[in-house]
Amino acid sequence: MASLTGAAAVLLAFILAYSTALTIYRLFFHPLARFPGPRLAAATKWYEFYFDIIKSPGGQFFKELSRMHDVYGPIVRVNPDEIHVRDAAWFEVLYAPNPTKRNKYRPSAEMAGLTLGIHGTVDHDLHRRRRMAIAPMFNKQSILSAEHLIKQHIDELTDVFESYLGTNNPINLQTTFLAYTTDVLYHYMFDTDAGYQRDSGAAQQWRHSMDAVAQATPFLKQFPSLLSRVALIPLPMLIWVLKRIQPDVAGLLGTHQLMASIVSKYMASKPEEDQDELIATKAVKPRTLFHAIEASSLPPHEKAPTRLAQEGLTVLFAGGETGSRLLAHTVYHLLKNPEILEKVRKEILDAAGDSNQLPDMKALEALPWLTASVRESLRLRAATTSRLPLVTEKPLAYADWVIPPNTPVSMSHGDILHNEDIFPDPMKFMPSRWFNASPQQNRLFVPFGKGTRMCVGMNFAYCEIYMSLAVILARFDLELYDTRWERDVHYTRDCFLGEPDPASPGIRVKVVADHKTFTRS
């Protein structure tokens, strides 16, 4: 017993000595020791842990980050290893285009547990090759060729809205639009019918799974390698356990199983003689995301089933939630501004003329009020609230500061898009600001990011959003139902994507009229 007590004392003494030495190093000898910021944040990552995990309702470090800049200036050491900059003029320096090389900060890349997808790729050159492989799925020509596919799912979306007419029940926009965007993604990317819009129970469960991810994200930011460790557990066993302790997360892992099944079917049906088709996909839209990767110049190990599945999951998770929340927020803002809504509706109907047919994407993009409303919603409600750290192998200069090489450096989209010097009255929904936008405003409209890590799905997102908005706004009269800015719309938590109050029931509307515009022909 005495020996155990002695060993514990030695271990405790070692931990205290190590912690003291590490703190002294970080405060006085670390390459970032001279940079401004709270001393406690420089000494330990538990400072950030407190704001993201302990301080209610979680995910609060983004507010503390803003306070740091108010106190210490535009460049701040936010934890022992990382620098954050709040200066719009420097955004295009950090998030620079090719040939500038920027690696992703490894903990940030590992957080989602999908290190084989483009979002989780650390190395700049490997990211560029992986991105080029899937680019044919996201170019404008490919997307415009699939308008008919998107229209099929818009028909199902209108069926959902129509089913609420006369019921006096509200429709949850985030749940409904998530089912739509997810169905479109499965069909367009994987040639698979997910059927969420035809199964309200499955749609609601998928919504709960996304909410569970949001709730877990602040924790995963603090322990970014956790999911990689969990992935070592066989998936069926992991699902069995989670169904009993956290069924919403188990549902998310069911998506991993489904993606593995989709990849298996693709691999089994891939004929050896399909090379002519693969070559042709370089000129037209590939049949699926996996066909695009197969047709690329990536080496064979980059076309392995596990790699394909992780790339598929990356696209699915990145595209579904962001598109659905943009749709919900745009509808919210237009319903709060009925005079703008009427202008948007009128120009959509004028573009259609007497045809009662939805105008194509090119025509919709040319509509000034619709375009300005989408841009303004993107600016106001840009999905990513987290800072986005990159690493460079060379020193970076900011003002009089020289940031050492291999230091993670980050900026935040909100600091640009809500900057009152760039966008006056920044928290007001004002689409008209885009009619006479300055070159600076257009250049710093960065909801999809900038540089080599810019969102690859921008054109796809615009297409599914423009087309569905045009139909919903022209066809249905909606009114908000018990929806409050402070509780249901305003971001109060950083869960990588911004999230409202945990008690929010979501943005909800009632369907009060159906004008039968753009109905099935």
Swiss-Prot record:
GO molecular function, one term: iron ion binding
Topology versus the membrane: Single-pass membrane protein
GO CC annotations on file: membrane
Cofactor (UniProt): heme
Pathway(s) annotated for this protein in UniProt: Secondary metabolite biosynthesis
Consequences of knocking out this gene: Abolishes the production of heptelidic acid.
One of the Pfam families matching this protein, by short name: p450
Keywords: Heme, Iron, Membrane, Metal-binding, Monooxygenase, Oxidoreductase, Transmembrane, Transmembrane helix
Family membership noted in the UniProt record: Belongs to the cytochrome P450 family.
The protein's name: Cytochrome P450 monooxygenase hepH
Organism: Aspergillus oryzae (strain ATCC 42149 / RIB 40) (Yellow koji mold)
Gene designation: hepH
